[in-house]
From Swiss-Prot:
Pfam families, sorted: Thymidylate_kin
Top-level taxonomy: Bacteria, Pseudomonadati, Pseudomonadota, Gammaproteobacteria, Enterobacterales
A single GO molecular function term of this UniProt record: dTMP kinase activity
Keyword entries, A-Z: ATP-binding, Kinase, Nucleotide biosynthesis, Nucleotide-binding, Transferase
Organism listed in the record: Sodalis glossinidius (strain morsitans)
Residues binding ATP: 10-17
Protein name: Thymidylate kinase
Homology family: Belongs to the thymidylate kinase family.
Gene of this entry: tmk
GO cellular component: cytosol
Gene3D superfamilies: P-loop containing nucleotide triphosphate hydrolases (3.40.50.300)
The organism's place on the tree of life at top rank: Bacteria
Length: 213
């Protein structure tokens, strides 16, 4: 089976960390040993430095929406070109904590940025590079944020209003409805139920990718 790029998307508190571990377990059960984990923003020294700027800002200086978007895509391009594409080229599978759908949901939905600007930027820097499968963990924002707060201190984006996350979720849901490479999982369920649903969906997808005898 050829190498694939699988991404986990979702709001804060949706359980992405647990889902990623589950994906890696399923892949290894299928005999796929060379699995590379990535996260966005981050994953390279430059991208990690940008992650800190995006999440924490610099002092009291406000971060404009466009500056935030450009930093996210700068980190993303560095990760794609420096880590993801080389890993896929050598035959490894890549499991990502977020990819560009996060920008479409958070910046396009949450921040209300122009969808045409987002698409133009995406096309210019990523072209036709896309994940083979995106598992979207759907959760009501109030529940997800309560889980995130229980983990500890929130970053600059996590302290946005509930309305911001409602808009972000709505955009995620619209993206999922229009993309046959996205699978939606109900992340408001107990962890065991989410894990079972993820395992089922991923196993079915892997079977469909296997070459015909």
């Amino acid at each position: 089976m050829n190498s694939k790029f699988i991404v986990i998307e979702g709001l804060e508190g949706s359980g992405k960390t647990s889902a990623i571990a589950q994906v890696v377990d399923v892949l290894r059960e299928q005999g796929i040993r060379d699995v590379v984990f990535t996260r966005e923003p981050g994953g390279t020294p430059l991208a990690e430095a940008l992650r800190t700027l995006i999440k924490d800002g610099v002092g009291e200086e406000p971060v404009t929406d466009r500056a935030e978007l450009l930093m996210l895509y700068a980190a993303r391009v560095q990760l794609v070109e420096g880590v993801i594409k080389p890993a896929l080229a050598r035959g490894a599978w890549v499991v990502g904590d977020r990819h560009d759908l996060s920008s479409q949901a958070y910046q396009g939905g949450g921040r209300g940025m122009d969808a045409r600007l987002l698409q133009t930027l995406r096309d210019a820097v990523l072209g036709d590079f896309r994940p083979d499968l995106t598992l979207y963990l759907d959760i009501p924002p109030a529940l997800g944020l309560a889980r995130a707060r229980a983990r500890g201190e929130l970053d600059r984006i996590e302290v946005e209003s509930l309305a911001f996350f409602d808009r972000t979720r709505a955009r995620y849901q619209a993206l999922a409805a229009a993309d046959d490479r996205m699978v939606t999982l109900d992340a408001s369920q107990p962890l065991a139920a989410v894990s079972a649903a993820l395992r089922h969906q991923l196993t079915q997808w892997l079977r469909a990718q296997a070459p015909s005898p």
